[in-house]
Amino acid sequence: MKTLIVAALFCTIGMALADDTPPPPPFLAGAPQDVVKAFFELLKKDETKTDPEIEKDLDAWVDTLGGDYKAKFETFKKEMKAKEAELAKAHEEAVAKMTPEAKKADAELSKIAEDDSLNGIQKAQKIQAIYKTLPQSVKDELEKGIGPAVPQ
């Protein structure tokens, strides 16, 4: 679920900068444009909230939609949990191959990303602050092993 929230927030930020509309999440495929727009507006409004607060707001919002949106959303959440488990396993495998310095940096960055007391903006700021202090070799290793740690 956190993956959805983070991805949707980056899409929303990108959408605001590029004035493009990102595709809707799978549970809103085929939904009227006003419903999709309301989804992205909710995320934009919630950008200063923590992940648990956003999840609560999303659950409440989906409940208001009626129809089969609730069932699609529940299926989507289950799929996201499975995807998160796959990503966590791949992350563990990548980290196992890293140098001690990169492992330490990854642990610091992961701790921030998983901190439910921080909102997305706070997480991004803290991650960027740490990332800027890392030696280039560690940044390269992190990006090679797990992808960019800081949104470009």
UniProtKB/Swiss-Prot annotation:
Keywords of this entry: Allergen, IgE-binding protein, IgG-binding protein, Secreted, Signal
Temperature dependence: Resistant to heat.
Signal peptide: 1-18
Tissue: Excretory gland, ventriculus, and the luminal epithelium of the intestine of the larvae.
GO molecular function, one term: IgE binding
Family: Belongs to the SXP/RAL-2 family.
Protein known as: SXP/RAL-2 family protein Ani s 5
